[in-house]
Structures are given as C-alpha cells and as structure tokens.
C-alpha cells in the first residue's frame, strides 16, 4: 500500500489526509501541537463551558469544498453553521444587506433598500459590477484594490462600507496593498457562484468541533496513524524524504515558515521562497457584556465603522450562535496594533458604537502570522518541492487568498497531483 506522511494537522493537512485515505494511501499524520486545526483551532480557555477559538472565522456559501469535506467526515454544515444572506449593516441599519434571492435580483433589491447611500452611491456600484462582469472579473495584475476602486469610480460610501470591509475580511490586507486580481476572483465566486454563494456562514460551535475533531475521528476509523504533540526535526524530515519512493511520499502541511525550516537542506530555493513571504495579523477581542438586561445584538454579526483608533471591522454575538450568552467577538483584520492597545481600543469602540456600558475583556487573541499579505503579483511557492516531497497550505500557489477554503482545496489538489504522479 502507498504511504503518505503528512507533517501538520491544520485544515490543509487534514483535508489532504482525508483525500489521500479515500485515494487508497496509508496516512501517517504528525502535528506539533496537542490540538489539530492549525491557525483555525480551539483554545484551552473556556467561556460558559465552551472553548474559545484562536480567532473568529467566517465562511461563505462559495466554500463548497469545505462544506463537502464536513459532510465526508460525518458532519452536517446546516447544523454547525448559521447561514444568512450577505449582511454588512452597522448597528444603525446603514449598509448593504442582500435578500435570499438569486443574483442579480438580490443585489438590485439589496441596493434598493440600503440605508445611508445616495442614488449616486448605488449607481456607482451597479456600474462597477457591470464593468467587472463585462471584463470577466479580471483587471491589470499590478492593481491594488484601491486602484480598482479608483478606476471604476466607486463612491466613497461604497468603498468605506462595502469594498474595504470585504477586502479586509477576505484578503486580510489593507486596500492600498491588496491584490485587485485576487479580490475580483473572490467576488466572482461569491456573486456568480450560484444561489447562496454569497451567504455568510458563521460557526455555531468552536473551531475544533467545526471540522478538525471529526477529521481526526474519521481518519482513525479508516486506519490512519495520528501523532499529536510530535514535532519533527529537519533531520527526521530529511530521512523521510530520503526514503521516499514511488509508493512513499512526504507532504509538508505546516505553515510556510515551518515548511521553510524543514525543507531548507532538501530544496533551498523552495525554502527560501517560503521564508520570503510576508504575513498579516488578525486580532480577536472577546468581550463579556455583564449587563443583566442584555438580550443580545440586533443581528448575529454587525459591521463596525472602523478607524485607526477604533480598529474592529465586525462584531459577532456568540450568545446568538451558541450557549455563550453575553460573549462578543470583535475582529480586527490586518491588525498592526499591540495586544494591550488593541484590547482597550476595541473595548471602547464596541462600548460607544453599540451603547454597551458593562463590557469586560475576556481574552484577546492576536494571530501574528494569520495569513499571507495578499499583494499584487505575489510569487507563491508551488506544491511540488522536489521528487518525493510536496507541500500544501493556504500559502501555496493558487487563485485564492489565505482562507479556510484555500487550505482545504490545497490539500485535496496536492493529493490529486500525487496520485497522477504515482499512477504515471
């Protein structure tokens, strides 16, 4: 039987492990941490008897490979995810909210009832959307999202209340640095990917229960070897690579900086390419509203007006999604502020914007290297490292930014490539 050794049990590694098992490989999975999930995992800390996460993650309906993987390992996405049409409204009701209709009727109806936008604002978005579709959602590869907005003459209100929060949440990169090409690809799949593609899918459970735990259980049931809390040295990886053959391969499914360390002596050029990648941070500030009269937010997710001193873009009502009543999760994408400052700023921002006076900071999680800095013409590493050695992850060359769907797809695609090589 063919054997695949996978280093890393994040979403890419788990996806690859399941796909490889289905393809007839015997899988040995190693993970340095004691919990699976990588940068989308549960923490040891609890609130109201449920684990906190290392960040508040958001999926969309276009994440079809992730949803399919959930079903493969015995999960029901409709139970674990709260689905709602795209809703980027502030607490005061301003902003875009799409009804649950097919495109383009949902966009037209949503624009028609959007509060806070003038007719000129709405017309600028309709004109831009028509232009993007006419150009097949493609643009100059050197453009940033800011340049894209300038070229399509989007109004300031549309840029501030729609494009900027979408760019930050999807690419985790500031508009003036973010790749317009990748941004348009995300918009294309969300807007033209069929009914429900632009829906927001908010987890009702902790990230471990959302996918990683079920993947581990499924893999165990199907004969995989799983070793958590086991960090492989570069020497061990080199020895495994030296033993590679037509029936035995090694897959690095760890973060790019770790993959660079492990592959440095095997493929210096590939490792150097990984090491050169730039990353951006995401901060999640968990807040507890201790007001006994607090009945939750108006909606499970609210957009927040953001600035340098009020940096959070979204706040999630965990009590509306789970049993964690009174717990809020405020998210700061492309975060550049220190932990203590971000906690104070976000606490003040949520207090003022939502008129909540009894707020306590429960936990602030800053994932320093959460995603790639998704800049124009980014040179991302290939999945093929050298003979017998492969890699997968949300940083590997592909059309999408660093997302859960990108990680899942990367894991599945590398197994397809491996199978083609071994069968060839």
Annotate the PLM regions:
Residues 21-46:
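Glycine-rich FAD pyrophosphate-binding loop
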Residues 23, 230-341, 352-353:
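Mid-domain catalytic core of redox enzymes
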């Amino acid at each position: 039987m063919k054997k695949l050794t996978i280093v890393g049990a994040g979403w890419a590694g788990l996806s690859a492990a399941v796909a490889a098992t289905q393809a007839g490989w015997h899988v040995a999975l190693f993970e340095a941490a004691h919990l699976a999930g990588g940068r989308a995992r549960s923490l040891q800390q609890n609130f109201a008897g449920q684990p906190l996460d290392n960040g508040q993650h958001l999926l969309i309906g276009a994440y079809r490979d992730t949803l399919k993987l959930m079903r493969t390992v015995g999960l029901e996405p409709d139970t674990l995810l709260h689905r709602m049409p795209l809703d980027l409204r502030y607490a005061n009701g301003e902003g875009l909210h799409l009804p649950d209709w097919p495109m383009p009727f949902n966009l037209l109806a949503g624009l028609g009832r959007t509060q806070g936008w003038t007719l000129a604002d709405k017309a600028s978005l309709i004109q831009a959307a028509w232009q993007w579709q006419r150009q097949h959602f493609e643009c100059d590869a050197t453009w940033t999202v800011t340049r894209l907005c300038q070229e399509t003459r989007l109004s300031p209100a549309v840029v501030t209340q729609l494009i900027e929060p979408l760019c930050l949440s999807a690419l985790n990169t500031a508009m003036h640095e973010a790749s317009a090409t990748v941004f348009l690809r995300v918009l294309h799949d969300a807007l033209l990917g069929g009914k429900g593609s632009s829906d927001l899918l908010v987890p009702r459970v902790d990230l471990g229960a959302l996918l990683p735990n079920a993947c581990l259980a499924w893999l165990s049931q199907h004969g995989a070897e799983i070793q958590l809390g086991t960090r492989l040295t570069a020497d061990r990886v080199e020895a495994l690579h030296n033993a590679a053959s037509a029936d035995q391969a090694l897959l690095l499914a760890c973060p790019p900086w770790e993959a660079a360390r492990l592959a440095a002596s095997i493929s210096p050029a590939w490792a150097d390419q990984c090491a050169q990648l730039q990353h951006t941070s995401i901060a999640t500030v968990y807040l507890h509203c201790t007001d006994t009269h607090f009945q939750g937010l108006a909606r499970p997710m609210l957009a927040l007006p953001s600035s340098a001193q009020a940096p959070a873009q979204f706040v999630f009502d965990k009590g509306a999604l789970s049993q964690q009543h009174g717990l809020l999760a405020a998210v700061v994408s492309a975060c550049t502020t220190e932990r203590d400052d971000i906690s104070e700023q976000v606490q003040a921002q949520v207090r003022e914007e939502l008129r909540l006076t009894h707020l306590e900071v429960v936990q602030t999680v800053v994932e320093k290297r959460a995603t790639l800095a998704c800049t124009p013409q980014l040179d991302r590493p290939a999945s093929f490292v050298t003979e017998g050695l492969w890699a997968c992850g949300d940083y590997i060359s592909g059309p999408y930014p660093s997302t859960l769907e990108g990680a899942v797809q990367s894991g599945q695609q590398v197994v397809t490539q491996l199978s083609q090589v071994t069968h060839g």
